Structure formats: structure tokens, C-alpha cells
Amino acid sequence: MDLQSMPQKPAEAFPLIAALDLGSNSFHLCLAKANIHGEVRILERLGEKVQLAAGLDEERNLSEEATQRGLDCLRRFAQFISGMPQGSVRVVATNALREARNRSDFIRRAEEVLGHPVEVISGREEARLIYLGVANSMPDSGGRRLVSDIGGGSTEFIIGQGFESELRESLQMGCVSYTQRYFRDGKITPARYAQAYTAARLELMGIENSLRRLGWQQAVGASGTIRAVALAIKAGGHGNGEISPDGLAWLKRKVLKLGDVEKLDLEGIKPDRRTIFPAGLAILEAIFDALELEQMVHSEGALREGVLYDLVGRHQHEDVRERTISSLMQRYHVDPEQASRVEAKALKVLAEVGDAWELNDELHRDLLSWGARVHEIGLDIAHYHYHKHGAYLIEHSDLAGFSRQDQQMLSLLVRGHRRNIPADKLAEFAAEGDKLVRLCIVLRFAILFHHIRGTQEMPSVRLKAEPKSLSVTFPEGWLEANPLTQADFAQEAEWLKRVGYSLNVR
């Protein structure tokens, strides 16, 4: 987890912070400076069209050609972030890598190029970050905002107020994927356009009612497709930069009349966006019609700006992941006193064995702390196999602030806190798998130590960690006088043997 570590250092202490957005259509880099008030000043913006989503085959494998396009772009970006310390750069990947079955190969190679971890984020986490970027880039309208962001492989919808998002959705429709499906040869016909529009309307049917129930006072569009539409409509004399149904209708007629992406020489549409513009326009028209929008304004802020503000928040002790963990505890009625006891003991043990077991990264501490607090959420489902229920809830929930990998690791930590440690699944994390086994052992020790749930004062113990063993020394005579704890640790020694560790208790 060396790449995943994040120093405990305020963002304003870094000369620069950076956000990389590995999108399905384009890769973007933002370099910025943060001040002590949490404000972010953008110093440099870079973007390259990569069209990663176009490289996905029918089996959802990313082609080597698309992989090389992405890596070549990242090599150029790497020059800008060379030497920047861990924790000052955050790299997020979206729909194309969410979908790619061979994403681990791309991620490994990308991390070698960048020297920083790549996080594949869920659609709803992407939506949360988009809203954060929009909210920090526009004046507060005083009411609810509906934010829409048409990406290369997915489209996100968020309703929020102020800086807080209330509803987040992500749909599998994007300007690159729809181009591949409906406009592959560049020809724009009314029939093809209608197919793309209808497909988007069908996707929207699943979320229309939930969006309408919450309501909004202002509709905002983010990212390149909506920006290009707004600029083209303004250049055509149909408004002052806002998007309206009339403006959309005019632009649609214009695009259909031209009939080919090579002829889309319209002001506001960059040459490298022409091929994907008709698909994006069809999706946007479907959004307007489905939600009966009268107007949409464009925001310059989007995902990468949201990543920067989220990065600043993490360093200023406003980590949204902490709120997510607290929400899980409340939703699933976790006993807060027991969770606190287990967390305190687990972190104390980590401090004692961290050097010997190479568990010194901040992420190790975070995972252990979170795991201790939510390890019992499965009890709200049933006691039988509650560790499996808890792991399932964590793996399959939308956890704001968590990357997919962090979420999977937390799920496995909860799964492994009792009975069998899922060594086969932990091994999927390659070199980090053994460290996750060690984190499981630390958490299991803390839980065993407080098996009696605070009804008895527990003694101080001495710990000694070696590469494949943990020795625990209780005060003389204490174990004999407490046979339940003695039996617990004897059984634990048997479980740990199955993953190649010995537990020596005396």
C-alpha cells in the first residue's frame, strides 16, 4: 500500500496539489494551490482526448491500442507532477475503467508511470465529486440544484443544496459509448439520432421520478459536451450562454442538416469533439425532455475540481469517509461503546506491531479504525454469518469518499474479523494481501480482547510480532482465572494456522 499512503499533512503545506481525471473520453490534469481557508486556486489545466471507452471490446476488455493512448498521455502529465509527494496528488478513474475487465493491468502500468495510486471510483462517488466541483465553482443559488454531467461512458445526475449532495445517480450512457453504437461511421441521420435519443430516454426512465420528487430550482450542466452545446447555441444567436429547449431544437436541426461529423464546423465545437458531439446532443435533448427542463446553465467546475476540494477536505479533517462510516454505524444500529472499545484496542495493538509487520501507512490505520467501527453491522441482518452479511453490505453499498479498492479492502477486513480469514480473496491484492491478513489478525485480537463487551476490566498484555507469528503474554495466572478468554485464544490459534500464522499465548 505504499502508493496508497497519505501523509498527515495539511494540503496548504504542499507547494502544489493535483487532480487527475481518467475519463472515458478525455484525461484531465489540474494543478492547484490550496490555502489555509480551504480555497483552491487553479494554476494549470491540461486535457487530452484519449477515448478509452472506444477501446472496450465486446468482452469488456480494454485494447492494447487504447491502453497505450492512455499511458502516452499519462507520461506527458507525469512531467507536471514529477516529485510531488504522496498525498498531494489524487488520480481517479471513471466509467471506462469501471467497465474494463482487465483494468488491473492498466492501473498497474499507470501507477508505474505516475508514481501515485489510481482509484477506480463508483458512479455515485463520481457524482458526489462532480457536485462538489460545481458547488465550489458557482455562486450559491439559494435552492436545490440539479447537476447533469455527460461523460464518455456514463452520465451523472445530482441534486444538492449548498455544498451537500442529497441524491446521486449514474446512468450507463455517454457520448463515446453512444457514438460507437449509433454514429460509428460519422454519418448523422434522423433515424440514428432518434435511436440514440430513445435509448437515452429509456435509461432516464429509471430515475425520473426520484429526481422529480426531490425537485430543484436550478439546472446546471458540467463538462465538455454540455459546454460545447452551450457555446454552439450562443454562437448561433440563441441565448447568452444558457441552454434552452428552443436552442437545442435549433442546434439539432443544424446538426441533422449537416449530416456528417466531418462537417460539424460550428463555433464552440472543437475539432476533436466533433465525432462524439451528435451522441452527446441526443443525450442532452433526452435529459431536457424527460425532466421538462426550461433552462440549463454551464459550470466550469466538475469532477477534477471536486477531487481537489475533496483532497483539501481530507487534509483539513473534513474527510467525507468519516461521515460515511458514522452513517453506516447509525443505519445498522452498531453498539457505539463496543465499537469504541475495539477501535481503541486495535489501534493500540497496531502501534505495537506496526513496525515489525510493516503496517505503518496511514491507510492501514484508517482501514483498521473503520473496520473496528463497522465490523458488527451485519448483526442488523442476522447473527448467523453476520461477518459475511457485513462484508456484503460494505462491498455493495455506495460509500461516499471511498475508492473501489478501499471499499473492497474494508469489506474483506470485516469478512475476516471472525472464523476463516478469506486468504484467497486477500491474495488478489498481490503483495499487499499479506498486510491485509495482518490487519485482520490485529482486528481479531482486539475483538477477542473485548469479547465480554466491557463487563470486565481487561489486563495489560505484552505483544511481540514476527513475520509469521504473534506472541501474547498475559499477567501470570490471569488466563487460568478467565477460561472463556483462554478458550477464545486457543480457538483463534487454530484459525490463524489456516493462513500460515502462529499465535502463541501464555
UniProtKB/Swiss-Prot annotation:
Pfam families: Ppx-GppA, Ppx-GppA_III. The keyword rRNA-binding does not apply. CDD domains: ASKHA_NBD_EcPPX-GppA-like. It comes from the Bacteria. It is a peripheral membrane protein. Its EC number is 3.6.1.11. It catalyses: [phosphate](n) + H2O = [phosphate](n-1) + phosphate + H(+). Its cofactor is Mg(2+). The keyword Membrane applies. It is found in: Cell membrane. GO terms for molecular function: exopolyphosphatase activity. GO terms for cellular component: plasma membrane. GO terms for biological process: polyphosphate catabolic process. Keywords: Cell membrane, Hydrolase, Membrane. Degradation of inorganic polyphosphates (polyP). Releases orthophosphate processively from the ends of the polyP chain. Homodimer. Belongs to the GppA/Ppx family. This is Exopolyphosphatase. It comes from Pseudomonas aeruginosa. The lineage of its organism: Bacteria, Pseudomonadati, Pseudomonadota, Gammaproteobacteria, Pseudomonadales.
